[in-house]
Amino acid sequence: MNEADARPTNFIRQIIDEDLATGKHNSVHTRFPPEPNGYLHIGHAKSICLNFGIAQDYQGKCNLRFDDTNPVKEDVEYINSIQKDVQWLGFQWDGNVHYSSDYFDQLYQYAIELINKGLAYVDELSAEEIREYRGTLKEPGKNSPYRSRSVEENLALFEKMRAGGFEEGKACLRAKIDMASPFIVMRDPVLYRIKFAEHHQTGNKWCIYPMYDFTHCISDALENITHSLCTLEFQDNRRLYDWVLDNITIPCHPRQYEFSRLNLEYTVMSKRKLNQLVTENIVDGWDDPRMPTISGLRRRGYTAESIREFCQRIGVTKQDNNVEMASLEACIRDDLNENAPRAMAVIDPVRLVIENMPEGEEILTAPNHPNKPEMGTREVPFSREIYIDRADFKEEANRQYKRLVLGKEVRLRNAYVIKAERVEKDEQGEITTIYCTYDPQTLNKDPADGRKVKGVIHWVSIPHAIPAEIRLYDRLFSVPNPGAEEDFLSTINPESLVIRQGFVEASLKDAAIEKAYQFEREGYFCADKLSTADKLVFNRTVGLRDTWAKISKQG
């Protein structure tokens, strides 16, 4: 199989293959054009992987262009975070970063060209009146009383707009197309509006700003984009995209192709809703590990490789569909199962004393990965007092319980076989200490007399245990499609974050931020950005097994 055969295929790649085969294009040039008004989320990751991935596979180019035409909502903070996210995902844009604002002078001249051709006019209807005049899907729109202005009058009024001669909302530039069009987007769409706001790139040079539909197609053309890829909600906008380029003097005419957006269950993708979660302090910022933002996923412990794999698995189609959270989790679980070093952590600790073990410590050797000897080993201190997880002990249990039971044996991971002899309880009847004996001949081997010990549990030596805050993250919402609810905040999962105070083994003392580990028998975790030498904090990335099938049945 050659490299081309190994590439993922989809309808967009088939179009590109045909364009190259017929000579329509000699090379491929795509772009990723986010608006810098928020943090990127997993849906943007799909677009990033598509646009940059196509450029890579076809030895082409992909631009990063900020669609910065609304200075009121934009911020340099978002520009910086978006660049970081793209690079973290493993991609690099061609040349310098582009901005739609780079083209404001040309866009203004193209607007004048449309006015000169009688294809644009200055309208003084209010925004509400424009909506009323636009009509509905069943009723055609009505012409604005300002639609018949002369070219000369429109040129003068447009210049007045630019010079700040109108208040915000008192005038706009509209395309003159067809108020009876069956496509509402073609009913004289607004091309320019007035905003007295300082722009992060152009300062106070402009008080009129072009609309997305006017800016987007011209920016594509000026950058010689061959294939302009966007999500399905822009399907009708393609008519306006082509109309603008057909009616101005510009040599390049890119084509727009639409694909389905990513809808992930148990979360929301709307920037407005995500912003509400942040501003109402329901989450801890845009990078809260429960957020679907790339920065949130990164903080939770997702790797760039797992997100790229997820985007490849879900594919590119024209049909909208909901993707199960299990699909995303399967990608990170597969990645970390293969690559994450193992460690031991006790999340709900109970003290265990091995009465027949001498004082002091014994240094044991544990593999960093059971199937990858090349990942080496680590030293794990063992002593007569250890922590085990409270759920790993019962005074009485049936045969299905393969952990420690009073009067029975279990193996300690990478250590010895122990037997529970007795327990100590507090006044409330809560077990405070489990007293055991151990078989010193069973270090990583079966008992000499042939008796079978089936269960294995993890542990941490108390004298060497490091206190850690363990953050158990779950889905943020309790219903699969919270965005469809009348009040999406009413569906917040109250157990989306459970904090435990536990202990981790000594080797994790210097765990690097975002470094992934498998806490044996517990799941995959990473050190949080709030983790310090004095207070370790670990985030659960994902459990060891898929819990979504069970959740789906319950739902």
Swiss-Prot record:
Key word Aminoacyl-tRNA synthetase present: yes
UniProt-listed InterPro entries: aa-tRNA-synth_I_CS, Gln-tRNA-synth, Gln/Glu-tRNA_Ligase, Gln_tRNA_ligase_bac, Glu/Gln-tRNA-synth, Glu/Gln-tRNA-synth_Ib_cat-dom, Glu/Gln-tRNA-synth_Ib_codon-bd, Glu_tRNA_lig_a-bdl
Catalytic activity: tRNA(Gln) + L-glutamine + ATP = L-glutaminyl-tRNA(Gln) + AMP + diphosphate
Residues involved in L-glutamine binding: 67, 212
Motif range ('KMSKS' region): 268-272
CDD domains referenced in this protein's UniProt entry, alphabetically: GlnRS_core (cd00807)
Cellular compartments annotated: Cytoplasm
GO BP of this protein: glutaminyl-tRNA aminoacylation; glutamyl-tRNA aminoacylation
Protein name in the entry: Glutamine--tRNA ligase
Organism, as annotated: Proteus mirabilis (strain HI4320)
Lineage, uppermost ranks: Bacteria, Pseudomonadati, Pseudomonadota, Gammaproteobacteria, Enterobacterales
